[in-house]
Amino acid sequence: MLISNEWLKDYVDAGVKVEDLAERITRTGIEVDDMIDYSKDIKNLVVGYIQSKEKHPDADKLNICQVDIGEEEPVQIVCGAPNVDAGQHVIVAKVGGRLPGGIKIKRAKLRGERSEGMICSLQEIGISSNVVPKAYENGIFVFQTEVEPGTDALTALYLNDQVMEFDLTPNRADALSMVGTAYEVAALYQTEMTKPETQSNETSESATNELSVTIDNPEKVPYYSARVVKNVSIEPSPIWVQARLIKAGIRPINNVVDISNYVLLEYGQPLHMFDQDHIGSKEIVVRQAKDEETMTTLDNNERKLVDTDIVISNGQEPIALAGVMGGDFSEVTEQTTNVVIEGAIFDPVSIRHTSRRLNLRSEASSRFEKGIATEFVDEAVDRACYLLQELASGEVLQDRVSSGDLGSFVTPIDITAEKVNKTIGFNLSNDEIQSIFRQLGFETTLKGETLTVNVPSRRKDITIKEDLIEEVARIYGYDEIPSSLPVFGEVTSGELTDRQHKTRTLKETLEGAGLNQAITYSLVSKDHAKDFALQERPTISLLMPMSEAHATLRQSLLPHLIEATAYNVARKNKDVRLYEIGRVFFGNGEGELPDEVEYLSGILTGEYVVNAWQGKKEEIDFFIAKGVVDRVAEKLNLEFSYKAGKIEGLHPGRTAIVSLEGQDIGFIGELHPQVAADNDLKRTYVFELNYDAMMQVAVGYINYEQIPKFPGVTRDIALEVNHDVPSSELKQIIHNNGEDILQSTLVFDVYEGEHLEKGKKSVAIRLNYLDTEDTLTDERVSKIHDKILEALQAQGATIR
């Protein structure tokens, strides 16, 4: 938002230099990103009057002008502008003057004729071509009224000014207007703020006889009003209006269109001007667009509408796209005489979706998207009527034609001085706090010790008492907060929490296994929000997503990890191993906060490098992925169990559910071939674990264990079992019967095929026996070993 200091003084005069004002505003939370000084680098720029013009004898495109610049004698200036003519008041840079870009004005001869100065265009004095009026886009600027020759040109142009550029956060939409900024400045400097004049002289004719207004969907359009102004004269706006629009970054068009833009900047309330004679009826109907309905907007583009768009219609066809852009056949033109002024409240979400879908961003749509002040809707329309009367000789009809309800202009919030002072460390009285709120334009009432503050609708960022406390701190001054040293009790040395220790260990383990940490977005598309979710829970969607691809909070980390892997593989990085620790979100129904759960996920594809210098590589498979998960469990002193399972999006025969203490906490598996193909991936393996559940298991610290002093005994067994019996089940039976001397088991071979009965498989398992206190005897080992074999046979296994 560009704030002209010259314009701001119409409403409030802080009595300080603009640099000091900018510094003060920045310290209170609105960042002044830049300062534009139109007088910088300009010297000896005056208004000149062209007394005569003659063609240059040796150049067809040059003219010799005699120009009165307020000195004893006129000066001769050679000018090549196509629109230069005698009788014009123009901008002249005198000899010895300077223009932006380091241009120095010197006496010169052009094709043999002396030239003592330069007749300037607006671009040559530093105005951007984007905002120069069309009439002067390719030539010099000509004043529309008489100005005394020799007058300082910047003063005559209302450009002897400094403009502050605000870098506003989304919550401070109130500062997107001159009036909103004036309230802020008045509060900062404890001075009075003067509002713009809105009272016009109305005719005896009523606008209710000219048109009617109907709203079809009050949820999308809570309020719509219109006023009628007759017999306007279309002409260029006065120079002061044009200058203020230019300084705000808007190109002047004509007085009627300029007034709608002027009031937009003044109040932050978008208006639209219709040519009443081209609306096509006396009826205005605000409705949802019909699917496939079309209209041509002011930029001469035909737009195809959808049923979520809001349109202003004449009862039959659209005449404007609500809050975004008007239609072409009802626009104000040079022939317009009667004007209908629209002021309305539109649903911010609908306006934003329409604006984004059609790629139509405007000053109006950006304000509707952030929400407008209901208190200013009718006031802004009245202001436009007043200006049309003053600047376009319009006749303002009585009454406004409206439909809907503006709602409350204020939101009451109770607060106490004790709460304010306790929160921010001030020692302010009720009177001082009330004074701050009154300067901000907030009405207050004090009852006992409770102060009720009526927050106006323009301050949509203030909804709770803490917001009010922030306002007190901002306006009174953060610099005024008393400084004090903290009081410390017993000081303890800092250390990592148990969870932090485990997380560090986990990261070291995964990175040691060759995985790289990834950090991805928490938002996914609605279509992928439930991909790979272990539990069926409601999703959480954003009210105003920036894009459809980031519209819903994730329930798994894998969708974005798959995207990241596909991105790398597409760029010739085919061996990808990533992990992520991040939060997922599960809904709890309307009005309830979601559950946030931390997950650990990983993805592996390509080849797994063992010793790159020896050329030893192996393709990543299920067991490598499982080995990574097993290593995590070992390092965290956890014991995972696995069972075959099915997860949507994973290979149905190569997926295992991971359990911890009887609770399913995740899975390991190969991506379903179709999912892999959709992402241009070869065989890819993933795992996802509930990290919060892992951290909740109480485990002791892993202490150092001495190397055994006594030798162990190893025995191998081969078992014939049904092919659907998992190896983990066999290992569990072995451990349940191995007593205290069975140290570990290892499945080292699985065979199905020739020499085995159909539906059977052979599983070879190595058993490691060890007694840390004594040497094992063959008799003792055999006794335990036989017990294990009997237990296996009892469960249907055949010893081979």
UniProtKB/Swiss-Prot annotation:
Example GO molecular function: tRNA binding
Gene3D superfamilies per record: 3.30.56.10, Bira Bifunctional Protein, Domain 2 (3.30.930.10), Ferrodoxin-fold anticodon-binding domain (3.30.70.380), Nucleic acid-binding proteins (2.40.50.140), Phenylalanyl-trna Synthetase, Chain B, domain 3 (3.50.40.10)
Per the annotation, how and in what number is the cofactor bound?
Binds 2 magnesium ions per tetramer.
Q: Which residues bind Mg(2+)?
A: 461, 467, 470-471
Residue ranges annotated as transmembrane are none
Provide the E.C. number(s) assigned to this enzyme. 6.1.1.20
FDX-ACB domain residues are 708-800
Q: Which CDD domains has this protein been placed in? A: PheRS_beta_core (cd00769), tRNA_bind_bactPheRS (cd02796)
Needed cofactors, names only, are: Mg(2+)
Which domain of life does the protein's organism represent?
Bacteria
Q: What compartments host this protein?
A: Cytoplasm
Reactions that this protein is recorded to catalyse: tRNA(Phe) + L-phenylalanine + ATP = L-phenylalanyl-tRNA(Phe) + AMP + diphosphate + H(+)
Please report the stretch or stretches of sequence annotated as the tRNA-binding domain: 39-154
Q: Where is the B5 domain?
A: 408-483
PANTHER family to which the protein is assigned, alphabetical: PHENYLALANINE--TRNA LIGASE BETA SUBUNIT, PHENYLALANYL-TRNA SYNTHETASE BETA CHAIN AND LEUCINE-RICH REPEAT-CONTAINING PROTEIN 47
Annotated family = Belongs to the phenylalanyl-tRNA synthetase beta subunit family. Type 1 subfamily.
Quaternary structure and partners: Tetramer of two alpha and two beta subunits.
Identify this protein by name. Phenylalanine--tRNA ligase beta subunit
